[in-house]
């Protein structure tokens, strides 16, 4: 199986960092393009006023930009074609939507993210993507 387009959801966790490393190795082997993707969610994060909420949105966007910029620099240093994007929403829905619309051949993602809730083997986002994605999903521990 050849993977020309690989989607790599990132959240800044150790597991997503390992997924990035694995995707770089796969991209080298298959001469693939990587698409680095971050989803932030502010569900239940409404502040006491609009100004606080706007500040929270800006922080989430800034964090997403930072995660993507660092990962993009790493990928480019390996001579791999890369694109980046971030969006707001439900992580599972947005990752699956992006994978379908972009017609990706593979999703490479970390086993667990930044959530404080620990699942036994994999996180709820990873599990949701596995169940709903149309392409293969590689989970990296």
Predicted regions and their residues:
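Structural beta-alpha unit
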Residues: 1, 73-107
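Small/aliphatic-rich secondary-structure junction motif
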Residues: 2-50, 74, 78
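Histidine-centered beta-alpha loop that forms part of the nucleotide-sugar donor binding/catalytic region
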Residues: 11, 89, 111-114
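Generic structural signal for helix capping and beta-alpha/helix-loop junctions
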Residues: 44, 92-94, 116
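A short acidic, glycine-rich active-site loop
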Residues: 53-66
């Amino acid at each position: 199986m050849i993977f020309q387009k690989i989607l790599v959801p990132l959240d800044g966790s150790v597991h997503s960092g390992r997924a990035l490393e694995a995707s770089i190795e796969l991209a080298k082997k298959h001469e693939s393009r990587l698409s680095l993707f971050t989803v932030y969610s502010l569900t239940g994060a409404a502040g006491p006023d609009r100004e606080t909420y706007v500040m929270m949105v800006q922080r989430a966007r800034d964090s997403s930009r930072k995660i993507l910029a660092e990962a993009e620099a790493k990928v480019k240093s390996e001579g791999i074609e890369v694109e980046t994007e971030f969006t707001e929403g439900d992580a599972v829905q947005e990752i699956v939507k992006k994978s379908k619309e972009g017609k990706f051949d593979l999703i490479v993602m970390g086993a667990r993210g930044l959530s404080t809730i620990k699942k036994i083997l994999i996180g709820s986002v990873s599990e949701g993507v596995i169940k709903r994605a149309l392409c293969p999903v590689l989970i990296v521990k």
